[in-house]
Regions:
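Extracellular loop and loop/strand-boundary signature of outer-membrane beta-barrel proteins
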Residues: 81, 135-139, 183-189, 247-255, ...
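Transmembrane beta-barrel wall of Gram-negative outer-membrane proteins
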Residues: 142-172, 180-227, 260-271
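Outer-membrane beta-barrel translocator domains and adjoining extracellular loop/strand segments
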Residues: 142-145, 175-182, 220, 226-234, ...
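Extracytoplasmic beta-strand/coil segments of soluble accessory domains associated
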Residues: 38-75, 95
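A beta-strand signature from Gram-negative outer-membrane beta-barrel systems
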Residues: 89-132
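Face-selective signature of the C-terminal outer-membrane beta-barrel domain
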Residues: 204-220, 255-333
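Short acidic/polar hinge/loop motifs at secondary-structure boundaries
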Residues: 39, 59, 74-101, 151, ...
Length: 333
């Protein structure tokens, strides 16, 4: 198994750090059983903390330390630790996941615990159509159900291949054992009453036996329903006088929590570049992260509501050369 997250495309046996590769079939099996993507990672990756059941992956550390998340080598962590890196892709589009445990400086700061590189599915030479439909319910009431549908078409020739996919999931309400709706997280936001859309296209050109050109594009949007929110009681009693907060419809807000992202990456590799292995990549990522309005208390009374939104535009380039100048010696720069 070749690991690309270390930029040198080495095998697991050649890696000095503890490394795992989780195949897409394992992830799909867990997702089809009703688990959310972050819960699957917490179960399959040793040493990673259990997820918060919401949109955020805040607190999901590896062996107690922070992690970096990438999609096909493109870093998703931003300068603000907003913890939306795993709200990034539908499992339908995952080929496998590479996990490197321990501190690594290859992809910048924030990776003292390790890194998770999500490798997306690519097109095959043979024409193929994939379709997936699923539903989950706790049978509490008519809102207690999730639905998902995904489709992909891929194909190509000996020298070129591509894949186009669309995955959509609708999350309904979540309820406890008494059939009461669980309270929405109005800080990091949850997944109840939300929609997720993941559109992805990939293309690969085999220039010759050594050289390859690979393109990855993605549009991802995961957003709450603009009709559901957290009711804080009459006169905000839930935060001022110990009243009860609960989830209900009737929300009217211009700030709907969610994640929206565009990503494009172009990678060129040459296994015999003047006797060296060359891997280069240029990429662009823009995203908008929106949070719920949140009350501020002054002398026991709500004085204001505030909401935050982070807009990010990131572009970059990487170039790695790997060679063996002497037997048993590897040189990477």
């Amino acid at each position: 198994i070749i690991v690309s997250a270390n930029r040198t495309h080495r095998t697991v046996a050649e890696m000095a750090q503890t490394t795992w590769v989780i195949e897409g079939q394992e992830i799909e099996q867990q997702v089809q059983g009703g688990k959310e993507f972050k819960d699957v990672l917490a179960q399959l990756i040793p040493g990673i903390d259990v997820s918060s059941q919401g949109r955020t992956n805040y607190g999901m550390n590896m062996r107690g330390r922070a992690i970096v998340v990438l999609i096909d080598g493109v870093r998703l962590n931003s300068s603000r630790t907003d913890s939306r890196q795993l709200d990034a892709i539908d499992p339908f589009n995952i080929e496998h996941i590479e996990v490197i445990s321990g501190a690594t400086s290859l992809y910048g700061g924030g990776s003292t615990g390790g890194l998770i590189n999500i490798v997306t599915k690519k097109g095959q030479q043979d024409r193929q159509v994939d379709l997936e439909v699923g539903s989950k319910s706790g049978f509490a009431n008519s809102n207690d159900h999730d639905e998902r549908v995904a489709a992909a078409v891929s194909g190509g020739t000996d020298h070129a291949s591509g894949r186009l996919s669309v995955a959509y999931q609708r999350f309904g309400g979540w309820y406890d054992g008494n059939n009461d709706a669980l309270i929405l997280d109005n800080t990091q936001t949850g997944l109840q009453h939300s929609d997720r859309l993941d559109v992805m296209g990939t293309g690969t050109i085999e220039i010759d036996d050594n050289r390859q050109l690979q393109l990855v594009t993605q549009y991802y949007k995961s957003q709450g329903d603009d009709d559901y929110g957290l009711w804080l009681g009459k006169n905000m009693s839930a935060v001022t006088s110990g009243g009860k907060a609960y989830t209900t419809d009737g929300l009217n807000s211009d700030r709907i929590p969610g994640t929206e992202r565009h990503l494009i990456s172009l990678q060129y590799s040459d296994a015999d570049f003047f006797g060296q292995n060359l891997v280069s990549q240029v990429y662009y990522r823009d995203e908008s992260l929106t949070f719920y309005p949140f009350p501020t208390l002054t002398k026991g009374q709500v004085s204001s509501f505030s909401s935050s939104q982070q807009d990010t535009d990131q572009y970059g380039a990487k170039l790695t050369l790997n060679s063996q100048p002497l037997a048993g010696w590897d040189l990477t720069w």
